[in-house]
């Protein structure tokens, strides 16, 4: 080969390489494994494009006709080595079903972010992928984590005026966002004519919900002149169909507060006497246990949408939570799984329905709102995720008011022997509800102090202070206040008789502070004349110069020990059983 032929060959190879690079789609051209990716696309006929920090393979696949696959067809793939790409992932995941779309999250340096989403054409293929490919060894010693993806299409919107109806909320949300399918609004437990100040908005896709969330972030848009709070709603728990076919417990919501468990049992047991085993009502919702699933389904179909005591009922099958998932939630709430599980206790324990509580507002609720440990375990106020529109990996997700399931009955602490019975606490202030920042809450209760006597039958404590130092001061202030109360007339005669028999006479007028008998009060500076002031000292005042009077000497329990200390020790405070003496203010002395 001559030099001219070699140059021509090199020129031809360069041109071919340039043409190949020109045909490579964006995101593939210049990739470390460009040749392998191009070979994959040539073999499968799929297309590939990179946008918004993710590289999409397929979506839809070649020859696809019809709508997007239904919800539940997507799986989350985690623990991907950062130098593994579609040429290695696609052969693994297409072995269990036809791939509709694979989205690999990418970094700016060309490596992946360690996770991806794979959407199959059918729901059964996604379930098979979870069963067979979880812990699949993609490389020696490197295992993939595969689980169902939470394709969340629902937003939580708080700060809505309570007088707005569902139709008004739907119309207003549709004006500022696109892809709105439905709005779920709950009536107030106390007043069915009002809503609870929040709503759930269902969108046609996760992307539409993510774009709406970005647009409605606090500070950007106001609804009806009100600031709103927006976040992802807690996704509905996807329970296996085989498990749901065995459920014989109904979840009933939108009950009146006054409705009793007996009324519910009578209403749901009308179709087959004795079919209802038990009813557990919590505020405005209840769980109804049936002896058989057939009776439960019959009652659900017959009573859903009917009225009970003036309220329209919503009846669905209760959703049990997977035991492993519940255990993970418990460990996360206690600090990342480091704490040991509580000892099983007998009996049923129901989780409180979070949407029955008041809405505290954004962002205060993220710090001290009700059911805080529901959303603190994974972070409360979350920003944008690493991927486009945020990650949809499973696990405890942060949300306002502890997260909602939009009316779906979930008895996560419903299983027998799963919960820990709550102990009765002590009442600081009657009828005071305290929102605790930590999981240890102060519950209402009553404690009697018999030693205080009938004169002071009730002590009203101050509201719990925020700071420890304030608490030290408040304790003394609010213990002194009840002591300053005058004696009640019923015990006046007994007090007068006791005072007459006392060693030291009582004062004739009620003192400003009176309480349990105390010993005489002495001056604190010896040999210094006090400034005379009329009425400054009470009748029980004993001067420092003459402590060992005959009257006081009779009260000494140890005269020998008292003599060592100059006659000031050894007095018996109990020797003043009924004396009511005045506590003098501080002695006033001239300055030096």
UniProtKB/Swiss-Prot annotation:
Q: Which PROSITE patterns match?
A: RRM (PS50102)
Note the superkingdom of the native organism: Eukaryota
Q: Which residue ranges does the record annotate as region Disordered?
A: 1-26
Give a GO molecular function annotation for the protein: mRNA binding
Residue span(s) of domain RRM: 73-151, 153-235, 248-320
Extract the coiled-coil ranges from the record: none
Q: Which family, according to the similarity comment?
A: Belongs to the RRM RBM47 family.
> Per its database record, what is this protein's job?
Single-stranded RNA-binding protein that functions in a variety of RNA processes, including alternative splicing, RNA stabilization, and RNA editing. Functions as an enzyme-substrate adapter for the cytidine deaminase APOBEC1. With APOBEC1 forms an mRNA editing complex involved into cytidine to uridine editing of a variety of mRNA molecules. Through the binding of their 3'UTR, also stabilizes a variety of mRNAs and regulates the expression of genes such as the interferon alpha/beta receptor and interleukin-10. Also involved in the alternative splicing of several genes including TJP1.
Kindly give the PANTHER family that the UniProt entry links to this protein. HETEROGENEOUS NUCLEAR RIBONUCLEOPROTEIN
Q: How does it assemble?
A: Homodimer. Interacts with A1CF. Interacts with APOBEC1; form an mRNA editing complex. Interacts with RBPMS.
Q: What is this protein called?
A: RNA-binding protein 47
Task: Name its species.
Answer: Canis lupus familiaris
């Amino acid at each position: 080969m001559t030099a001219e032929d070699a140059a021509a060959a090199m020129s031809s190879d360069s041109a071919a390489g340039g043409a190949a690079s020109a045909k490579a789609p964006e995101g593939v051209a210049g990739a470390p494994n460009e040749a392998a990716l191009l070979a994959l696309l040539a073999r499968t006929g799929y297309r590939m494009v990179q946008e918004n920090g993710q590289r999409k393979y397929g979506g839809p696949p070649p020859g696809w006709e019809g709508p997007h696959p239904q919800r539940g067809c997507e799986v989350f793939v985690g623990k991907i080595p950062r130098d593994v790409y579609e040429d290695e992932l696609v052969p693994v995941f297409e072995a269990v079903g036809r791939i509709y779309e694979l989205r690999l999250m990418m970094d700016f340096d060309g490596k992946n972010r360690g996770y991806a989403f794979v959407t199959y054409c059918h729901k059964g293929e996604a379930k098979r992928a979870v069963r067979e490919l979880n812990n699949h060894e993609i490389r020696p010693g490197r295992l993939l984590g595969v689980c169902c993806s939470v394709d969340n299409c629902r937003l939580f919107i708080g700060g809505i005026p309570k007088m707005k109806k569902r139709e008004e909320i739907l119309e207003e949300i549709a004006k500022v966002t696109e892809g709105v399918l439905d709005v779920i609004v709950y009536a107030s437990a106390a007043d069915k004519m009002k809503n609870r100040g929040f709503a759930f908005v269902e969108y046609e896709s996760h992307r539409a919900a993510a774009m709406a969330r970005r647009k409605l972030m606090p500070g950007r848009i106001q609804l009806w002149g009100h600031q709103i709070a927006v976040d992802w709603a807690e996704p509905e728990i996807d329970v296996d169909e085989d498990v749901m076919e065995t459920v014989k417990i109904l979840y009933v919501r939108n009950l009146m507060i006054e409705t009793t468990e007996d009324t519910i049992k009578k209403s749901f047991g009308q179709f087959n006497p004795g079919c209802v085993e038990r009813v557990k009502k919590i505020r405005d919702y209840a769980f109804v246990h049936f002896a058989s699933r057939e009776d439960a389904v019959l009652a659900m179909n017959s009573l859903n949408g009917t009225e009970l005591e003036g309220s329209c009922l919503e009846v669905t099958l209760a959703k049990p939570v997977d035991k492993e998932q519940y255990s993970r939630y418990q460990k996360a709430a206690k600090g990342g799984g480091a704490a040991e599980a509580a000892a099983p206790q007998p009996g049923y324990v129901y989780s409180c329905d979070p949407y029955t509580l008041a809405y505290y507002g954004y962002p205060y609720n993220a710090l001290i709102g009700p059911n805080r440990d529901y959303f603190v375990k994974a972070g409360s106020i979350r920003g944008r995720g690493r991927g486009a529109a945020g990650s949809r990996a499973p696990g405890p997700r942060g949300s306002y008011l502890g997260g909602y399931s939009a009316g779906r009955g979930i008895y996560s602490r419903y299983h027998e022997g799963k919960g820990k019975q709550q102990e009765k606490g002590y009442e600081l202030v009657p009828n005071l509800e305290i929102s605790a920042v930590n999981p240890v809450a102060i519950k209402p209760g009553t404690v009697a102090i018999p030693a205080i006597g009938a004169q002071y039958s009730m002590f009203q404590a101050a509201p719990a202070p925020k700071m420890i130092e304030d608490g030290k001061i408040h304790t003394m202030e609010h213990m002194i206040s009840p002591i300053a109360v005058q004696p009640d007339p019923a015990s006046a005669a007994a007090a007068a008789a006791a005072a007459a028999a006392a060693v030291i006479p009582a004062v004739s007028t009620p003192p400003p502070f009176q309480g349990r008998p105390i010993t005489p009060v002495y001056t604190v500076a010896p040999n210094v004349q006090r400034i005379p002031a009329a009425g400054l000292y009470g009748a029980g005042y004993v001067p420092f110069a003459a402590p060992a009077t005959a009257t006081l000497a009779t009260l000494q329990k140890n005269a020998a020990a008292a003599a060592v200390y100059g006659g000031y020790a050894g007095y018996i405070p109990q020797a003043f059983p009924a004396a009511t003496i005045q506590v003098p203010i501080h002695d006033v002395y001239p300055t030096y």
